[in-house]
């Protein structure tokens, strides 16, 4: 069954002191008021989403609220693109509005937004959609003394768990693996077997002889095949363990997911199947258990 990748964001409310805010409101009362105001935005047929052009005129982005169920709203938002077409030796500008899906979860304890990543919508940059929505929400919320901050969720990952989940659960394939090999002389505490240590010294020696800044090994395959990366293989497991423990890098290039590096934190994402809204509600966002929100990340 076809799946679509969504990037997960977490939102929170900030109380702004102004004429519309009661200063004696408790924190709980303020948050409840913010949630009530925010939820009411999705009772209409669309949101007021726009961005000012360089000349100051607004560029509006078409959107449509498709459905709301149990505090979860599914909407679609369009990009605005001008393309040049040539016909009969004449160039004409043509407007096109590719769209992507957005799911907003206002349920207590969830407070998150999922944005579909499509390469032809805002060039696949979901943060641009986040910024547009954040501005649209704040134009309304600020009247009631609130602002909303929407930030990416960061997924806490284990290397082998991530690879296994992507290959077996998401049916992804691996087209390339790049492993950075360290100079063993720079890390006297490198805990590895004599055979592995000799191999690392050989790679380091070749790098020095060729005046290379670093040493890597590249593993790749053809378009119709996939590389195998399994924990059962002792030598492979040992190499991955070295990379993870000592801060060296192993990069796995998936065909769908893109590159996953052992040293990097991952953005929380979710692969949705056909019925987007039902899938969202029924699966109850189990990914939430494996994700954390960093207040210093995103913006």
Label every PLM stretch briefly.
Residues 1-80, 120-299:
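Terminal interaction module
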